[in-house]
């Protein structure tokens, strides 16, 4: 029920708002799109997918930079820890580490020989355990000079032997549970 009065009021409001309206066809202010008589101007605008791809690339780059920074920090911390552990293990005295490694090799030889006797069928599961079992059985069956040579070879690399023997012991415990 638009009376002529309502139409007049609506036209006046539209005329007042035209000054702030941009035509979507020619991109000029002052008239509505349906009133436009000009041609459509070309305005280069990136597509929505291109904008989304740019945003994703920026996020990935930020994450990569953050992860690279974090890994560099972690590497520095690990290097510091390694250098501290190496210096502390080397300063602890090489004689005590050699005697500890020889006693560890003798105890591991006796335990691994028991394992090899009881579980010969499972010895093929890990080459390191089978080689240690073979060397331990040969050292236990042969004279003490061979075990002395084993301990001297293990004492030559004291830091690596102490780390490897500590790593081997939990594996042997797992085998006993099976």
From Swiss-Prot:
Pfam families: zf-CCHC_3. GO terms for molecular function: nucleic acid binding; zinc ion binding. InterPro entries: ZCCHC10, Znf_CCHC_sf. Residues 85-113, 121-164 have a biased composition (Low complexity). A zinc finger (CCHC-type) spans 21-38. The keyword Nuclease does not apply. Keywords: Metal-binding, Zinc, Zinc-finger. Residues 66-178 are annotated as: Disordered. The keyword Metal-binding applies. This is Zinc finger CCHC domain-containing protein 10. It comes from Mus musculus (Mouse).
């Amino acid at each position: 029920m638009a009376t002529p009065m309502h139409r007049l009021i609506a036209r006046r409001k539209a005329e007042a708002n035209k000054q702030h309206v941009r035509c979507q066809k020619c991109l000029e202010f002052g008239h509505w799109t349906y009133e436009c008589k000009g041609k459509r101007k070309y305005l280069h605008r990136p597509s929505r997918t291109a904008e989304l791809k740019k945003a994703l690339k920026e996020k990935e780059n930020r994450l990569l930079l953050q992860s690279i920074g974090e890994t560099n920090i972690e590497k520095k911390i690990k290097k510091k820890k390694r250098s501290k552990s190496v210096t502390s293990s080397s300063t602890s005295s090489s004689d005590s580490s050699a005697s500890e490694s020889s006693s560890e090799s003798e105890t591991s030889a006796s335990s691994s020989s028991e394992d090899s006797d009881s579980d010969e069928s499972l010895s093929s599961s890990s080459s390191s355990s089978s080689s240690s079992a073979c060397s331990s059985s040969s050292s236990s069956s042969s004279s003490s000079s061979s075990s002395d040579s084993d301990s001297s070879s293990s004492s030559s690399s004291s830091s690596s032997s102490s780390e490897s023997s500590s790593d081997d012991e939990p594996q042997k415990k797992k085998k006993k549970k099976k």
